[in-house]
Amino acid sequence: HYRWLASMAGVGNATMRLKSDDIFYCCLPLYHNNALTVAWGCVLSAGATLAIDRKFSASQFWDRIRHYDATAFTYIGELLRYLLNRDATPHDKSHRVRLITGNGLRPEIWQQFQKRFGIERIYEFYGASESNIGFINAFGVSETAGFSPLPFAIVEFDADSDEPVKNTKGHLIKVKKGGVGLL
C-alpha cells in the first residue's frame, strides 16, 4: 500500500499533476507496475479517468488514443521507439496527449519523439517494484531519469569481477560526482 501512496504522491501529485478532466490511457497489462501502480496512482491522486486497453498495438496506438480522447499515457521500454519507427502521417499530432510517463525511453530518440508527436512533457523515471529507491524526472529535464529525494550512493564497480570495489577496511567506495558505478 505504501508504494501506491508513494506513486500517487511522487508521480501523480508532484510530477504529472493531472486534472480531474484528464484521461490517462494505459495499454499495459495490469500486472505490470507501470500500469497498476503508476497509471492507477496518477488518476487516483487527481480524480481523473483511467482508460484501460487490452494490449499495445503500434499500428493502432494513436487511433486508440484518439478514441479515448486521452491526455496522458504510460509507456515501458521500447514502446515509444516502436511508435517512432512507424511511417510519419499528417495525423501524428492529432490528439490531446500532453503528458506521458514511463521508463526506458532512449535519450537518442527523446527529443525526436517529443517533437514529432507534439508531447509537452515526458516524465521518465527509474525504479523497480522490488527496489528501495526510485528516480523521477519531476522537473521535465529532457533525457534524464531525474532525481531521488531519498539518500543514496553510487559505488565503484569492477566490471571484470562483476563485484563492487571495496577499500582496505572492506567498505564500498563511493564514486566521485559524475562518476559511473553501481547504485
Name the predicted role of every residue range.
Residues 3:
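Ca2+-coordinating acidic residues in Ca2+-binding motifs
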Residues 28-32, 174-176:
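AMP-binding (ANL) adenylation modules
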Residues 6-23, 31-71, 86:
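Conserved AMP-binding/adenylation subdomain of ANL enzymes
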